[in-house]
Amino acid sequence: MFKKLSSSLLIVSACVFSSCTPTVKQEIAILPTPVSLTEQSGSFVLKDGMKIGVSDQSLFPAIGYLQEILRNVISSSVEVTTDKNQVDMYFQLKDTGGKPGSYKLQSTPEYIRVEANDYSGIISAITTIRQLLPAAIEVQGEKQTYSIPVVQIEDAPRFEWRGFMLDASRHFWNKDEVKHVLDLMSLYKLNKFHWHLSDDQGWRIEIEKYPLLTEKGAWRKFNKHDRTCMARAKEEDNTDFLIPEDKIRIVEGDTLYGGYYTHDDIKEIVAYATQRGIDVIPEIDMPGHFLAAISQYPELACDGLIGWGEIFSSPICPGKDATLEFCRNVFKEVFELFPYEYVHMGGDEVEKANWKKCPLCQKRIRTEKLGSVEELQAWFVRDMEKFFLANGKRLIGWDEVVADGLSSDAAITWWRSWAKDALPTATAQKQKVIACPNEYFYFDYA
């Protein structure tokens, strides 16, 4: 989208400690600050051959994640069991009466015990254990002995939705880069990965029914931003600006930039995120920001009206039944790949001038007894929501759709900080709101 996040990877600096002391201890600094924390004297020392118990086999993936965190701490793999006796750490799913994601953590010199309402609470507790350890564990080096202070912690998330958005259309991030983002999200206890997979500049998700979306729609000629990056990489001898070769193709003499995610890539990333307690929220932006698709399937647009309007690109034609069917078919495949409650369909920054000139759009307005092209967009968004709900999904849209008559099942992403009425309007309609006003949350506005 025209205004979306400048996709940036958060960078966490890992400090390497060299010390003659046998045990490396960490000052207590947990982010976010727990609801309650009590520290006592003593510490729990991590050691080879530890035994970890779980109350339920569904926690095995979480313990696998813990083992990844500890890979630079202990030399041998830990033993995982469903027996709670004679274990060094025990993780238990238990109704603690708290909110989703809450947990209790107790460490003593002999053991660590965790109780959590659900899987996400277990992951948060594991992240707290990670933060109780020195940053040196994040890098591979000479093995040292690490300890965790004796503490009692009770914690619960303040916000249900703790998200990060990655725009993979303007700039394509490969599978390993996406996983790195998920690792950093987990470190900060973020739980919703908003994945912007389509826009004017590139289509990034394989749709088997429409192969041209990725065969051609995932690749673009170098634009001014791409050329500037490559020039600076050369001029400044700085590889940070260099576009990797795996994201470049030469086709008929043209240098093309792009890439996309196959179904297998997405399944792998979804599994990786799920292990870390993160939901993946895919976004297929429509009816605007759709030029990457329209360029390959021009019949989706109003006849003869493809390209750019005064500000934004030409949208799809909601007057054509075939266009509506295309949108539903795309989302059918998306629904199958993402086993989560919500899917984002955009709905922002739509250039509606074409609809005023399009006979089919005008016919749709008359047939549906609508009064304007604004109401035509609202009709399209409501029609898509009906399709979402029929397929067991809830729709999210950017705050431009707040006046489109969506049900209370929908959620609104409030990004326009100047749209002051969006938040109270959505809450009055009993719709959940994801607050990300651009003035505070967008990297390119910071």
Listing of model-derived features with the role each one plays in the protein:
Residues 1-29:
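Bacterial Sec-dependent N-terminal signal peptides
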Residues 169, 198-202, 285-289, 348-350, ...:
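Active-site beta-loop-alpha junctions enriched in small/polar residues
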Residues 293-299, 304-409, 416-419, 423:
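Active-site neighborhood of glycoside hydrolase catalytic domains
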Residues 20-161:
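Contiguous, structured surface segment used for ligand recognition
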Residues 162-165, 194, 282, 342-344, ...:
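Structural recognition of the beta-strand scaffold that forms the well-ordered cores
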Residues 402-408, 415-446:
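Conserved alpha/beta catalytic core and glycan-binding cleft of carbohydrate-active enzymes
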Residues 98-324, 330-342, 383, 387:
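Feature activates predominantly on carbohydrate-active enzymes
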